Structures are given as structure tokens and as C-alpha cells.
Amino acid sequence: MFNRIFLFLLTNVAVLMLAGVVMSVLGVNPAQMSGLLVMAAIFGFGGSFISLLLSKFMAKRSTGAQVITEPRTPTERWLLETVRRQAQAAGIGMPEVAVYDGPEINAFATGANRNNALVAVSTGLLQHMDQDEAEAVLGHEIAHVANGDMVTMALLQGVLNTFVIVLARVVGGIIDSAVSGNRDSGRGFAYYIIVFALEMVFGMFATMIAMWFSRRREFRADAGGAQLAGRSKMIAALERLSLNHGQNTLPSQVQAFGISGGVGDGLRRLFLSHPPLTERIAALRAANGTAM
């Protein structure tokens, strides 16, 4: 919790410093920006935290995940017992456990906090992974919950949203004034077109930052899964995932929280939420002092 608060404060300080430099260079009076900053923060953080609060509901609805309340099969019983054991070891509340219909080998975790989470696995995972590999995948998802990754991503996304809204309007106003030659006139239609275009451009860079952080947290979740299930099991699970070439059926709003992400080269890698599986496996093999 304290790590997330520190990261949040540090990110805000960095953003404020950068905003101050940008406004100084562009000749913008910070005193005139208070209203815009408040509006941007309300929309930037509001949307991010509403998504976080609704994440469990939306994930279950979009994937059709069925929560296991009373296990009906040995597999469901094993899933509940494994998640319960790992949650206790990680010091978090027991998450809801669900299964969703999907041919790919995948799983995801979501939820507003460490004690109100959801861990779901695909039917494809249950069909193609053995229990050791599945245990490691569950450990990976429990590590996401224990690390508070969903909350941290919401905080980061809120900061980035706010910065995009503010910077697009500041730069858009300057461009509009320079083109029109009249700083005192009201904003015309061209201003809103410029702002929209700038939000697209700045939003692209904000997405790169968010995805960079997402890739970092995947390495941490792999390490957490190795601690909970064993490093050899975690490596075996990732190797199994590398053979999974089926289409990812997870909805876009859930894909960032799955254990298996997309693949890509060049610039496309900057927009991927997951690092390449080869890099994740190499990081685990290079780690020392991890539980086997």
C-alpha cells in the first residue's frame, strides 16, 4: 500500500514539474490553469476509478465467467483450494474464482482492492495445462492482486489522462491563437479540432507509458507466481503459453490483466501490455533465491 502511495505521489510530482516546465516554455500563466486542472483531474481520475470499481462486474459480464460457489467437479474443487492456499500465503482476502469459456490458454485477475478480487481461468487452460502449470498461473494472478496492480494502473491512468487533457488544451489554445492572430477572441471550431487531434497524439504516448509499466508488472507477477508455486512450475507454465497460438478471446478491457498477451515487433511492442514470453522465461531463469 505504501509503495503505491509513494509511486502515486512521485508520479504526480513529476507530472507537475513537467507541466510547469511546459507552461513556462509556452508562456502560459499557471494561475489561469486552476480551473482546467480541476476539470481534467475530475474527468481523468473519475473515468479511471469508475472502471476500477466496475472491473469485476464488467469482466464477468464480458467474458461470461461463471463464479464457482459450490464446486461440482474435482477440477473446480482443486481451483478453489489452490487459490485459497495461495491467497493466504500472499496475505490477501479470498478472491472469487471463476471459469470462462475460451479456447486459448489464459487467465486474468481483476478487482478494486486486494480483498475484493476475481481470478478467472479459461476452459482452454484447464484442458491444456497440467496442475503444476495451472498452479503457477494462479500464483501469477494472485501476485497481481497482492501487488495491488489494478489500483496502481488506475492511479497511473488517471495521472496520464489528466496530463493529456491539460496539455492538449494548453497547446491547442496556443496554436489556435497563433493561427487566428487574436488571443482575445473566443475559441472557434478549429480550436476543438486541434485539441481533438492533440489528444489522439498525446494519448498515444500516454498509452506507451501505461503499457511500459504494465510490462514491468508482469515480470513482478511472474516472480510472485514463482514464490507461490515454484520457479520451475512458473517457467513450465510460460513455456506452455509460448506454444499457445490460439486467438485471444478476452475482451480488450480485460486483456491487460491476462497472463498471456499479444505479440509484436518494432513499434508495436511499445503498445503491448505483456513482454515477450522468452524475456519472461529468461528473467525467471536468471533470478536467484526464488522458491523452487
UniProtKB/Swiss-Prot annotation:
Keywords of the record? Cell inner membrane, Cell membrane, Hydrolase, Membrane, Metal-binding, Metalloprotease, Protease, Transmembrane, Transmembrane helix, Zinc
Q: Does the keyword Cell inner membrane apply?
A: yes
> Could you confirm whether the keyword DNA damage appears in this record?
no
- The membrane spanning regions, by residue number, are 5-25, 34-54, 155-175, 193-213
Which residues are annotated as active site?
141
Coiled-coil residues are: none
* Subcellular location per the Swiss-Prot or TrEMBL entry: Cell inner membrane
Q: Which cofactor does it need?
A: Zn(2+)
Known Pfam families for this protein?
A: Peptidase_M48
Q: Which HAMAP family match?
A: Pept_M48_protease_HtpX
Q: What is this protein called?
A: Protease HtpX
Q: Which organism is it from?
A: Xanthomonas oryzae pv. oryzae (strain PXO99A)
